[in-house]
Amino acid sequence: MGSLDTVDMGQRAIDQIISELSLNEKVSLLSGVDAWHTFAIPRLGIPSIRTTDGPNGARGTRYFNGVPSACLPCGTALGATFDKDLIFSLGQLLAAECKAKGAHVLLGPTINIQRGPLGGRGFESFSEDPVLSGLAAASYCSGVQDGGVVPTLKHLVCNDQEHERVAVSALVTPRALREIYLLPFQLAIRGARPGAVMTSYNKVNGLHASESPGLIRDILRGEWGYEGAVISDWFGTYSVADAVNAGLDLEMPGPTRFRGPALMHALTSNKVSEKTLNERVRKVLELVQLASRSRVPEYAPERKLNRPEDRALLRRAAGESVVLLKNDKNDNNNSPILPLDREKKTLVIGPNADIAAYCGGGSASLLAYYTVTPRQGIADKCGADQVVFSQGCYGHKELPLLGEHLRTIETGEPGYTFRVYTEPPAASGSFKGNGSRKPVDELHMTNSSAFLMDYSHPQISGDTYYATLEGTLEPPESGVYEFGLTVAGTGLLYIDGVLVVDNKTVQRAGTSFFGIGTVEERGERYLEAGKKHHVFVEFGTAPTSNLQHHGVVSFGPGGLRLGGCRKLDTDAAIQQAVQSAAQTDQVVVCVGLSGDWESEGFDRPHMDLPPGTDELVNAVLEVQPNAVIVVQSGTPVTMPWADKAKALLQAWYGGNEAGNGIADVLFGDVNPSAKLPLTFPRELSQNPSYLSYRSERGRVLYSEDIYVGYRYYDKARQPPLFRFGHGLSYTTFHLSDLAVRETAPYAANIKESSLRVSVTVSNTGARPGAEVVLVYVRPPPATCSVGRPVRELKGYEKVMLQPGETREVSIAIPVGYATSFWDEGCDAWLSEKGLYFVEAVGTGECNTLVAPLSVQVSRMWNGL
């Protein structure tokens, strides 16, 4: 078939198709044909559908040399907006981006829980709170589905760390599993009915999630009545019969490892019944039917979208995600430091000022249409002549990508030439260049991070082949330059024919390329300004390396990454920044992490900022206490200077428009309204998962149980650095007239009972602004039969108000969700009778109202 817009598979048609499928055809439908596509059965009109990563943008089918895409702010940034309408609109944009990439299924959103601050993929998820996560996911999925594309909730469940992620068993109590880790999925399914759910890599209580009948058959499909498709994470299938019988419909990617002949054998040996096979086939066919709404042709060419209205939406999202953590008074005029004055000269300092930290690493990463650095955003707003830059220190973990600074030898275009060979290079101890080998492929590229998982060529069979990277580098100034080569495979880097980096002879295992690569090996070379220096990399794919990795996913041919920059004297650079800051009234210091530090494939070893960063911030604040500190990270970092800083922003990874979003908030074009979706501890040891985060002998104990994030800090009376829900504004708000009304308080079926929480919100300041009203419920401590958190978020709403404007905000919450805990003895939710308290919390520590809620009868319930 050429197009999915002709697919018409109603229930009767699907029954008919199943009856006409051969056994081999049925089996083929249950796995991918390649990295991103499902099998087609042309004789029966069953097309292939295309999937694409990921949660913050539609990358398309190519990690390697891919087509640029729109990049949304990361998951924690979207969670910080507390804006359901905005997230719905971003979902619509994602659907349009999927269609531009010829994709029918989007592999997002990610709704795992940040039980600690170190998770490599923590930036992908919305929040440490399951209600915020679930409601945000429902809005996201609704927006994607509104555009005719199928969203995928991932990863079911407890994929909360990267360390040994395919081997580790998350040991979690049934209560914590239900109240914290499954609840986001439950709420998202209740609110949006997304067409697909992806299972996680890890085990849950000893059994891999992708073959867990308890998770897939009993809870997801049985209790919740979920009717969509269940697909594996990529290479996250571990069995034949167990996975099929548990309810895993689609193994990805292809070619299959556990379906195909192995599944045929399981059928003939009665380990899998044909009835069960037909159930799995039906779900795949229903997924194809759902995907037909997109009207995207099969194997459509990938294209760019990059519309003006999309850029405006992305800028709005970037600005609305920035959290104003502190805004004390200026020593000079007794007014709040922010917003800044665009007419004044602004000094911009720091490692994140002149780089685009727009997304985290791993499957969430993509090649953006464009990026905006904080320095660029500020210069565009104030004028380049009003902005001065000082580096201060570097913040990279791996050296900055070199590709865009290279030029091709043949034409002088930006980038380099990438040649692929089936033959290895001639054995030699010296530089030989490309030699007499004939390349089977030759590409012009600019991105010098080349992950080859989805590279293909007719003359390449298997994962073993070779490649060269060649170009010239003309540095702007003379000096010692540092170069880095990271590989999942083997690699040698030559500069002007001299071996500078050997990442082949002796290799050290690292975390690159989803955990299958090496550490970055570095070397130095003196370069002359204005001279064209020859850069050449000799690369062999992953099978040419003898490195062994445990507990990680293997991605075939591997990849290479080439970085480089001028070597920096950090002490001298900090001193230069301090001298400039002492002479400037308006200073912005941009620090933080990037996709080097936060990525799928590994967890952070600590919460600290990169070396030199804290020294830079402290030194600048000593001479300019009014300096504004901007932190970019997807999850919490330590800020030992936070008490000293007077103005502080948390800016996350803001997508394409990150720099503009930061500048909009700094200069008051956007009034900050975001709130922290995560608790920021003062130090790593303060967080509740501190003693039990990594895998130990194949298991990780969720020892904090239900006391994740703010639930722990409230219970332990431990004040963190910044609490969940914290975020300031340039205006002021006042809450009043809290009212709580319950419908059907005595109904035997608690699903007939609901709460209506209403509160009056007034903008009492001089600027337009948006207020986020958070609704918490406090259980009755005197009558609870089990220990419970002090309070739990149950709903929220965001409202935009002009100065002096007053509006009523109303939030509906089912009574069951508002008052229940998971009763392990009864295997059900229990809403106990007693006197609860409903809190409405706004901006500011004292802006809280409380109202009683009397639950008259105890009731149990299951399902959605």
Swiss-Prot record:
GO cellular component, one term: extracellular region
UniProt cross-references to InterPro entries, sorted A to Z: Cellulose_deg_GH3, Fn3-like, Glyco_hydro_3_C, Glyco_hydro_3_C_sf, Glyco_hydro_3_N, Glyco_hydro_3_N_sf, Glycoside_hydrolase_SF, Ig-like_fold
Stored PROSITE patterns: PA14
GO MF term list: beta-glucosidase activity
SMART domains xref list: Fn3_like, PA14
Catalyzed reaction equations: Hydrolysis of terminal, non-reducing beta-D-glucosyl residues with release of beta-D-glucose
Active site, per annotation: 233
Glycan-bearing residues: 434, 447, 503
Recorded metabolic or biological pathway in which this protein acts: Glycan metabolism; cellulose degradation
Name the UniProt record assigns to this protein: Probable beta-glucosidase J
Organism (species): Neosartorya fischeri (strain ATCC 1020 / DSM 3700 / CBS 544.65 / FGSC A1164 / JCM 1740 / NRRL 181 / WB 181) (Aspergillus fischerianus)
